[in-house]
């Protein structure tokens, strides 16, 4: 019987819900855990969808990949940004390697696969696809079958940061999207017999966390007991588990199955207006304030007086205005650069929250966490409150009374990302449950290749985590 590997990716599925709170109510996931290897999966720095999935599937860290989030600096100018789609991925993925070796692959919804690249098999691209009017399959002719089977494929739940009156509509879209994706996956298993590697990624968990976390987490500062969405995330997890069960029922016993996520989730307390803080501290100087809230690249900044600026998001990126690197750089390379970095690290780590308590902010130098640093990296990553707070990048028309805010500048959002996702792997039937420690997202690609009996490229940064290899490293 042919050896195969299937990965079911659940973007943002988080261990405190899957492993700790709801496992007994997720029978299909529980059955894989009871006969497989499982544990928390350390995400990338930063722990975010792009670059995490591609780091997972290339076994290379973001520094090697050369992109550090969905949007990245094009160069060392102040305003040029680009979206990291598939054209940014220069390192070989698992499916690239398998395709070159004559193995058949099927991909559905894996982040950063748009625009589609040729594979030895079939592909449906990801949430970065602008619409299904674009070419979102490989081969192009596969598009008609996808639309017929799904009744109209849904790429993403657009508007997941919607206002209150839109929540029911978007919630229905999340369910419809998930249903169609799993329907397509079942169809592919039923109608294709020659695949070796199958991977799908469902974005629904991420969307539902960001939209409904405050309604379901009693520890969230905005939680209200008895609200109409209290069981919303729980109900969705049970729905996903049922669809996983239907898909597993289509597989033979020689198929190894992995369920993985790229990062976890946690309650978001609020936001730190990062650039406003930098203005207050004298690092960022404006010529004038904007007429409406705006990011730095759209503001009238006095770059000749500016030492550093930042970006917003679930984590912050801090850039230093370096002489000879940025167009109007003021900080000399070497000792002055390292001095201001050290100064900023010290100040950010000491930052109190809105109540005056130490926030426990983590600050990361790229060179400390990456094997090498390519592209145009930030000078520092900042995880406010150890990811309990987000970075708000907007600069306001008038100086705010406080750098702390409890309303998101890009729409309602009450969950942040967390450092650990989930890893569950059933290699073969009839084995005992084994909880593994120290699992890293980069371990997935070499593990898949090993399961298929394929040689693991020497430059992959992760470890093989099959049952035979655990404990040997």
Go through the PLM ranges and name each one.
Residues 3, 10, 17, 24, ...:
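Secreted, luminal/periplasmic, and some membrane-associated catalytic domains
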Residues 7, 197-201, 258, 424:
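Structural motif
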Residues 28, 343-350, 422, 443-451:
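Generic recognition of well-ordered alpha-helical segments
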Residues 98, 200, 318, 382, ...:
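A short aromatic-rich beta-strand->coil structural motif
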Residues 171-193, 198, 214-259, 263, ...:
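A long, amphipathic alpha-helix that forms part
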Residues 377, 397, 438-440, 444, ...:
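Long, internal low-complexity/basic segments
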Residues 386-445:
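Low-complexity, glycine/alanine/valine/leucine- and proline-rich hydrophobic stretches
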């Amino acid at each position: 019987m042919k050896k195969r590997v299937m990965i079911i990716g659940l973007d943002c599925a988080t261990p405190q819900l899957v492993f700790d709170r709801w496992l007994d109510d997720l029978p299909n996931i529980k059955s894989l855990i009871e006969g497989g290897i499982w544990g928390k999966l350390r995400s990338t720095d930063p722990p975010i969808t792009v670059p995490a999935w591609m780091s997972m599937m290339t076994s290379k860290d973001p520094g090697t990949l050369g992109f550090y989030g969905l949007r990245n600096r094009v160069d060392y100018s102040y305003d040029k940004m680009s979206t990291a789609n598939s054209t940014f991925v220069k390192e070989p993925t698992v499916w690239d390697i398998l395709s070159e070796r004559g193995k058949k692959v099927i991909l559905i919804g894996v982040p950063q696969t748009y625009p589609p690249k040729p594979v030895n098999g079939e592909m449906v691209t990801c949430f970065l696809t602008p619409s299904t009017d674009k070419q979102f399959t490989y081969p192009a002719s596969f598009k008609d079958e996808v639309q017929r089977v799904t009744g109209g494929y849904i790429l993403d739940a657009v508007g997941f940061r919607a206002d209150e009156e839109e929540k029911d509509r978007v919630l229905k879209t999340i369910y419809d999207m998930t249903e169609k994706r799993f329907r397509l996956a079942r169809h592919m298993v039923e109608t294709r017999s020659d695949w070796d590697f199958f991977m799908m990624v469902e974005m629904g968990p991420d969307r539902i966390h960001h939209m409904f976390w405050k309604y379901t987490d009693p520890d969230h500062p905005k939680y209200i007991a008895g609200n109409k969405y209290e069981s919303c995330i729980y109900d969705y997890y049970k729905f996903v588990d049922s669809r996983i069960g239907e898909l597993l029922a289509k597989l033979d016993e020689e198929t190894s199955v992995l369920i993985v996520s790229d990062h976890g989730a946690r309650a978001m307390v609020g936001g730190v207006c990062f650039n406003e803080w930098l203005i207050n501290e004298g690092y960022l100087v404006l010529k004038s304030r904007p007429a409406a809230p705006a990011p730095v690249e759209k503001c009238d900044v006095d770059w000749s007086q500016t030492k550093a600026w930042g970006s917003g998001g679930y984590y912050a990126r801090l850039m230093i205005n370096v002489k000879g690197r940025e167009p109007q750089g003021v900080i000399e390379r070497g000792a002055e650069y390292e001095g201001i970095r050290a100064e900023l690290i010290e100040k950010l780590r000491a930052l109190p929250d809105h109540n005056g308590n130490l926030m426990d902010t983590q600050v990361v130098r790229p060179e400390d966490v990456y094997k090498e640093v390519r592209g145009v990296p930030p000078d520092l990553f900042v995880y406010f409150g150890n990811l309990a707070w987000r970075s708000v990048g907007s600069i306001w028309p008038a100086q705010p009374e406080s750098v702390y805010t409890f309303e998101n500048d890009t729409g309602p959002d009450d969950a942040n990302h967390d450092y650990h996702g989930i890893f569950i792997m059933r290699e073969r039937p009839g084995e005992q449950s084994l909880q593994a420690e120290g699992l890293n997202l980069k371990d997935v690609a070499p593990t898949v290749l090993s399961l298929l009996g394929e040689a693991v490229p020497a430059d992959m940064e992760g470890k093989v985590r099959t049952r035979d290899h655990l404990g040997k490293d």
